[in-house]
């Protein structure tokens, strides 16, 4: 059987591939900033992203900014593709009164995003745990070696440390994420939710603002998640991590690295949505708007 031609002939297959392109674009464009964010969050000392960057470059070299990228990059095609697929299903399921020829309602978009965030946490938790530990270490062991080590010492439960906090972070954040994207793109280019003819600038701005909104909303939970997953065994659970972190470093610790995260969120999510939408149009042979490249 010729699997690939048959797979690409389906709308599901083309949407899956487009989602993969979006995920790869997001990882490559924002990974150095993500590494800086992780370093800021786990540090017991407040330090600017620039000072951490300077120290990393001096001690560990430029490659340290991309350490651990293989883990999310290897899984991101499947993960991001599934996120868009699951969202498309749930956004319709939560508001079935909307005709299929119309775009999903904003209510369906928000609830579909919440459900999508909860489901994708099952895949994301072990990937992010490995990524975080690779980003924090100064040795050069790879993701497979680290995963085998965790499985040998702690079993599957070790890879899923932080699942609850990941669900708590991602479910509401994804609801806000997709709602913001749909709302902003419609405001910037009225009617585009139905026609799909927004320009590249609209995709980049709407995607970027969606990323910023979702990260600001969930950031304290992300700080707690990073500390739980770093592997030092200093915390017994979510409440213990929150309590100890605030007691030792004050409430500002919950927002440490936010500036770096916001900058990364705008770049990454603008790239994700732009790459996804452009790839989808190419795969469906849909003629894009004449100004898609110029953004006029």
Curated annotation (Swiss-Prot):
Q: What induces it?
A: By hyperosmotic stress and dark-induced senescence.
What processes in GO biological process is this protein linked to?
hyperosmotic response; proline biosynthetic process
Q: Which SUPFAM superfamilies match?
A: Mitochondrial carrier
**Membrane topology annotation:** Multi-pass membrane protein
In terms of pH, the activity is described as:
Optimum pH is 8.0.
Gene inactivation phenotype reads: No visible phenotype under normal growth conditions.
Which segments carry the Solcar repeats? 13-93, 104-187, 198-282
Is Lipid metabolism one of the keywords UniProt gives this record?
Answer: no
Q: Which superkingdom heads the taxonomic lineage of this protein's source?
A: Eukaryota
- Which GO molecular function annotations are given, in alphabetical order? L-arginine transmembrane transporter activity; L-histidine transmembrane transporter activity; L-lysine transmembrane transporter activity; L-ornithine transmembrane transporter activity
* Family, per entry: Belongs to the mitochondrial carrier (TC 2.A.29) family.
Please identify the protein, giving its name as recorded.
Mitochondrial arginine transporter BAC2
Which organism encodes this protein?
Arabidopsis thaliana (Mouse-ear cress)
Protein's gene: BAC2
């Amino acid at each position: 059987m010729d699997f690939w031609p048959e797979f690409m002939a389906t709308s599901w297959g083309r949407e899956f591939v487009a989602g993969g392109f979006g995920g790869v674009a997001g990882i490559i464009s924002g990974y150095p900033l993500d590494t800086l964010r992780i370093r800021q969050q786990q540090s017991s000392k407040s330090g600017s992203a620039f000072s951490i960057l300077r120290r990393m470059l001096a001690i560990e070299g430029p490659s340290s900014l991309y350490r651990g990228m293989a883990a999310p990059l290897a899984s991101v095609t499947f993960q991001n593709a599934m996120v868009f697929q699951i969202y498309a299903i749930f956004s319709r399921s939560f508001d079935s009164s909307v005709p299929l020829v119309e775009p999903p309602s904003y209510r369906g978009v928000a609830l579909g995003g919440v459900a999508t965030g909860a489901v994708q946490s099952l895949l994301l938790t072990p990937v992010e745990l490995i990524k975080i530990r690779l980003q924090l270490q100064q040795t050069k062991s790879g993701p497979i070696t680290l995963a085998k080590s965790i499985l040998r010492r702690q079993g599957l439960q070790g890879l899923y440390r932080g699942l609850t906090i990941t669900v708590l972070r991602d479910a509401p954040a994804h609801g806000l994420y997709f709602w913001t994207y749909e709302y902003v793109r419609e405001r910037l280019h009225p009617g585009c939710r139905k026609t799909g003819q927004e320009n590249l600038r609209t995709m980049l701005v709407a995607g970027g603002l969606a990323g910023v909104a979702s990260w600001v909303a969930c950031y304290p939970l992300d700080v707690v998640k990073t500390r739980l997953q770093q592997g030092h065994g200093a915390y017994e659970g979510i409440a213990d991590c929150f309590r100890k972190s605030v007691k030792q470093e004050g409430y500002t610790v919950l927002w440490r690295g936010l500036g770096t995260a916001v900058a990364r969120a705008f770049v990454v999510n603008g790239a994700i949505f732009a790459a996804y939408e452009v790839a989808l149009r190419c795969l469906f042979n849909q003629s894009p708007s004449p100004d898609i490249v110029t953004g006029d």
